Regions:
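Glycosyltransferase-associated regions of secretory-pathway enzymes
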Residues: 1-168, 194-304
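Single-residue recognition of alpha-helix boundary sites
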Residues: 178-181, 213-215
Length: 304
């Protein structure tokens, strides 16, 4: 019944508090640019005393037995490392290792040439005194540098194995949300619905007890970092109640229009701002309070 729906408001507008039940899958991510730094038959995820990331994930899986725990991975892994991942899945049957390579993200792609050409024509349509000639030259050079077979936004993030690689594909995975588990074709995922939500956690977020059901505003919430009283949205936690959440689609739209878009600040933060019509004259700290994923049973950011 509608009466049961709770609302929260930001800037005078009401938003439903959407419910993530206690079976909503959790997703961790490990994109490894140098698998050779691990043993050839070891799980290629850092697990030191200082940064026990693998243990944190295993701990989450043992506490949250009713949930599926995805580990979204990418890297040139050795066969023995892949076997070690399979053994991990065997030892903890709710852990599902999802290889980036096994998932089709093409529905979120756009040709790089289109992004550059749109930006070039935007510049060229301006009166000459308003044009940024330096930028125009740069865009034309970038356009001519696109290699055949690589005219693709999603492929461009595979070439650079930096932060953008992990951040961009994290956004792609969260657009798929629960569907990611179905597409990975893993045993035991079939009772997920195709539009199921998902909660992404960085591997330095430690779960201490079951999270239970969680309410999030309009179906999305993210981690908020507070330093000296200043808040900022972070992508260390992203929770959505469905696939193709409109806030993440708004972020993707920015990635599709800006030639120098950033997957974290544009793909997540600016997409969320746009979705909730946040404008710069509003109090950013109170917006962060509104969108924050808060939970007493998660110790946040332990690797600081």
């Amino acid at each position: 019944t509608n009466r049961d729906i709770q609302f929260t408001s930001f800037n005078g507008k009401d938003y439903p508090l959407c419910f993530l039940d206690e079976k909503t899958p959790l997703l961790f991510q490990w994109f490894e640019r140098n698998p050779a730094r691990f043993g050839k038959n070891d799980i290629p995820i850092i697990n030191t005393e200082k940064n026990p990331y693998l243990n944190n994930i295993i701990k989450a899986a043992t506490i949250e037995k009713e949930r599926l725990i995805g580990i979204f991975v990418d890297g040139d892994f050795f066969p023995g490392q892949k076997d070690a991942f399979s053994k991990l899945e065997y030892d903890y049957e709710n852990i599902k290792v999802i290889y980036r390579n096994d998932i089709d993200f093409s529905m979120y792609d756009k040709k790089l040439s289109e992004i550059y050409m749109e930006n070039i024509s935007k510049q060229e349509s301006m009166p000459e005194e308003k044009r940024d000639c330096h930028l125009l030259q740069l865009l034309k050079k970038e356009l001519s540098d696109i290699q055949e077979g690589n005219d693709s936004l999603i492929k461009s993030y595979l070439l650079d194995k930096g932060h953008g690689w992990a951040d961009f594909y994290r956004n792609m995975a969260m657009l798929k949300a629960g569907q990611l588990f179905l597409e990975a074709d893993k045993v035991g995922c079939y009772d997920l619905s195709t539009n199921s939500g998902c909660i992404y956690l960085d591997a330095d977020m430690i779960i201490t007890e079951k999270l239970g059901g969680i309410y999030i505003p309009d179906g999305i919430a993210v981690h908020v970092e507070r330093i000296d009283g200043r808040a900022s949205m972070e992508n260390g936690i992203i929770a959505v109640d469905r696939n193709n959440h409109p806030a993440l689609l708004a972020g993707l739209e920015i990635m599709h229009t800006k030639f120098d878009a950033d997957p974290y600040s544009d793909g997540v933060c600016n997409g969320i701002r746009k979705h909730f019509n946040y404008s710069l004259n509003e109090d950013y700290n109170s917006f962060c309070d509104f969108i924050e994923f808060k939970h007493d049973n998660i110790i946040m950011n332990t690797s600081q």
